[in-house]
């Protein structure tokens, strides 16, 4: 089919690399670093980031449980279109519950999705928070904030877990590359 033709033409196996983790755990940093590294290696890849999609594709959504679900549903549907076209996506989204992760997996397809848990303790995330969102959440200025006033369920069985508290982003990116390249490498 079309996807096989595109994968062969692009010389890669299309996958959705889904980064899940607390706010300020390092998803965007890892996602953009990974995108650059993969582009440098000759892969065709697109970063989809929560902060960006919420300004465009999902600008009509808030942070209620229903809106979070719709946010993930839309992103998963877009990701599926990319994968069906032979393109790799890197998705940096909090995706706080197993239910939402399952929804993404159902839409994208289990074989197409590589789940990465970007792990960092909440104290570390809070210390990194330049926008002061955690502080605002603790004072009640921001409601439904993941990790403070809304739950974050630790992924039960991610394909890979990366700890961003102890290593520099460059080291984390190198580690992720080692894990991901064999999965997306094209073999004729």
How would you name each of these model-derived features?
Residues 14-16, 44, 88-90:
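Residue-level preference for the first positions of well-ordered beta-strands
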Residues 47, 113-117, 159-161:
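Conserved beta-strand scaffold positions in the cores of enzyme catalytic domains, especially
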Residues 56-62, 79-138, 144:
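ATP-dependent NMP and nucleoside kinases share a basic, alpha-helical "lid"
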Residues 1-17:
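Extreme N-terminal, non-catalytic leader segments
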Residues 32-77, 84:
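Conserved substrate/cofactor phosphate-moiety recognition/catalytic segment
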Residues 119-175, 183-188:
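Small-molecule kinase domains that catalyze NTP-dependent phosphoryl transfer to phosphate-bearing small molecules
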Residues 27:
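Conserved lysine of the Walker
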Residues 23:
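The conserved Walker
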